[in-house]
From Swiss-Prot:
It comes from Solanum lycopersicum. PANTHER family: PROTEINASE INHIBITOR TYPE-2 CEVI57, SERINE-TYPE ENDOPEPTIDASE INHIBITOR. Sequence repeats lie at residues 27-83, 84-143, 144-199. The keyword Disulfide bond applies. Disulfide bonds join 30-118, 34-114, 42-124, 54-91, 57-75, 58-87, 64-100, 117-135. Belongs to the protease inhibitor I20 (potato type II proteinase inhibitor) family. The gene is CEVI57. Residues 1-23 form the signal peptide. This is Proteinase inhibitor type-2 CEVI57. Keywords: Disulfide bond, Protease inhibitor, Repeat, Serine protease inhibitor, Signal. InterPro entries: Prot_inh_I20, Protease_inhibitor_I20.
């Protein structure tokens, strides 16, 4: 009798752990909806001793450090992308280059496509169509997309399929492949898949 009791408890424990892992994975995945963002600002490292940038400590971004051509630190930027400083527009001839947390990629993201606050990069700031600050990105790396089917999707076309209509597909705006276009029943474009979209297993 004791053996059956232990076995039953062991099964309950395994089931509980499985449910917990599934819940955590689902919570970490971003939703299927696209954001309605206007643009994003991702301060990135710019310039070099041979190709200096045009900026100054006032207009330089917070979190970015600015240096002389010989590598000596000058200042940290003081302008918050959420609420930029009103600064003189002159170039400080002493500043040659900057080092920022996100050292790769574009500084200005426009348009943002299907990016949301969840899938946007940490250290990037996202703004609405009206130019008002919306959020800072939450992902250190692109977050996994939920595999939930978006019921609005009637068909999609993808470059890999020669743009033929693919019907009865289980997909959403986050998990769609790069360049794939999702359409609703009346033929209106819902969204276009982006390179950063990855799906969870």
């Amino acid at each position: 009798m004791a053996v059956y009791k232990v076995s039953f408890l062991a099964h309950l424990l395994v089931l509980g752990m499985y449910l917990l892992v599934s819940t955590v994975e689902h919570a970490n995945a971003c939703t299927k909806e696209c954001g309605n963002l206007g643009y994003g600002i991702c301060p990135g490292s710019e310039g070099s001793p041979e190709n200096p940038i045009c900026t100054n400590c006032c207009s330089g971004y917070k979190g970015c450090n600015y240096y002389y051509a010989n590598g000596t630190f000058i200042c940290e930027g003081t302008s918050d992308p959420k609420n930029p400083n009103i600064c003189p527009s002159y170039c400080d001839p002493q500043i040659a280059y900057s080092k920022c947390p996100r050292s790769e990629g574009k500084t200005i993201i426009y348009p943002t496509g299907c990016t949301t606050c969840c899938t946007g990069y940490k250290g990037c700031y996202y703004f609405g169509q009206d130019g008002e600050f919306v959020c800072e990105g939450e992902s250190i790396e692109p977050k996994g997309c939920t595999k939930e089917c978006d019921p609005r999707v009637a068909y999609m076309t993808c470059p890999s399929s020669g743009l033929a209509k693919l019907n009865q597909v289980c997909v959403n705006c986050c998990s769609a492949g790069e360049g794939c276009k999702l359409y609703d029943n009346d033929g209106s474009l819902l969204c276009t898949g982006e390179p950063q979209s990855i799906s969870t297993a």
